[in-house]
Amino acid sequence: MIGKLRGLIDSYAEDFVIIDVGGVGYQVHCSARTLQALPSPGEAATLSIETYVREDQIKLFGFRSDVEREWFRLLQTVQGVGAKVALAVLGTLPPADLGNAIALRDKAAVARTPGVGPKVAERIVTELKDKAPAFANVDPGVVRLSGAIEESRAPQPVADAISALINLGYGQPQAAAAIAAASRAAGDKAETAQLIRLGLKELAK
């Protein structure tokens, strides 16, 4: 089984890249986000690989990190999610944002993925809520905020600050992560305006 490829970028197609490794061209399917991050043809690249072996074909899927590959595997444990949908999700949400979206039960963020409807998005956040934290780099502050929001225990300035960032166009996972960091920096008595200001600084990093 192939676990990693290191070689020169030969060419690109809509959903895959050809990597030249010692004169052999490997066709590797990647998410749109990964394809955009890879270098120009002729330059070197390294991808973590998931190998699928079927009776009639061998298919390679490539990822920029082992964490992204683990997400690819985990997503496919959800009913109705195959390799194509898993790649589409990872093309829409990077691993950290996907982890935060699941921690926040933010099915709307997942549903922004082309081809993923509300029902599949809900299954993803529901079925993975207990599995994802085992390896995902989920902000502990987001997890705490998730529980507090669900139980209506979040301080009002925190809830208002998250709402304000969402109204500015940020997704709920990004807004919650930024305000979680702002809350840690400012302390429990921080007011809404201060949290928004610090949250925007976090998002600008």
Curated annotation (Swiss-Prot):
State the GO CC annotations. Answer: cytoplasm; Holliday junction helicase complex; Holliday junction resolvase complex
Q: Does the keyword rRNA processing apply?
A: no
Q: Which GO terms describe its biological process?
A: DNA recombination; DNA repair
Query: In Gene Ontology terms, what is one molecular function of this protein?
Result: four-way junction helicase activity
| Keywords carried by this UniProt record | Cytoplasm, DNA damage, DNA recombination, DNA repair, DNA-binding
Any one Pfam family here would be HHH_5
> SUPFAM superfamilies given for it?
DNA helicase RuvA subunit, C-terminal domain, Nucleic acid-binding proteins, RuvA domain 2-like
Record protein name field? Holliday junction branch migration complex subunit RuvA
Q: Which organism is it from?
A: Bradyrhizobium sp. (strain ORS 278)
Its organism's taxonomic lineage begins at: Bacteria, Pseudomonadati, Pseudomonadota, Alphaproteobacteria, Hyphomicrobiales
